Amino acid sequence: MMAEMFRIAGQNIRIAGGSICRLLSGFEVPAENQTDTDVCRVSLTEGYTQFDISSVTPDHPVEHVFSIHSCPGHFMVSDGDYTNSTALVVKPREEGVMELFLAALYSHMAGRARTVFVHASLVEMPGQGGVMFVGRSGIGKTTQARLWEQFRGAEIINGDKVFLTLDEDGRGVTAHGSPWCGSSPYKLNRATPLRGIVVLDQAPENSIRRLSEHEIMTQYVSHIFLPMWDARLTDCVMEAIGGMMPLVPVLRLSCRPDQEAVDMTWSAVFGETAQ
């Protein structure tokens, strides 16, 4: 079975089988840079007519079984540390297969790479770092990203889903684009030092303030995807969150969709007076 390698948030993932790999376009690893070390492997088998765990014979042990409730007929079995997974699909749907890929990758990374996955948009200011906008669906994450593009020349890395990793020295946080972008068209394969996290709220007047530790837990952490299927991985993600929080300011922006909101946030994150 032909396998393709991709690199997402610093993690290699090798996927074999299925045409769905086109959805990961832009995250391919060139042949000359591929490696077989520290690789998450997923094989995709389409056309299952019945799911019977006893009949599944992958070339790896089976300790975990996943199903996608929103996409019936999409299943996955994984070994103990999620290094090897086999996706079993009755009739492939793009969102279902991508959810399986995400479950395999996030499970593999959460226990190793001090990684969290956030419902957020991400912009990068060249030479300065990134700003991440967090909030419920429809609150204006992509709108804020576009305003930063318009008024500050920022580049939009992703409009909906972002990986964060704690740097090896524990002194910084890196934000990574991902192939998962929701309904937005933005999904660059780019990483940037994270300078600020902005929790969004719509309001008739613009204001911004730094959140307390308690507010961070209630207003920001609720937008982080926790791997609730595995208690150990959930503990790893919570530990990563705890390591990241002292390193990056978490702000609450109550705002209109205008330039003043951009300038106000710029000053709060980068410590400069907006010009």
Which stretches of residues belong to each language-model region?
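Conserved lysine of the Walker
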Residues: 141
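Hydrophobic positions on the alpha1 helix immediately C-terminal to the Walker A/P-loop
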Residues: 144
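A noncatalytic interaction/capping subdomain that flanks phosphate/NTP-handling catalytic cores
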Residues: 1-137, 147-157, 162-275
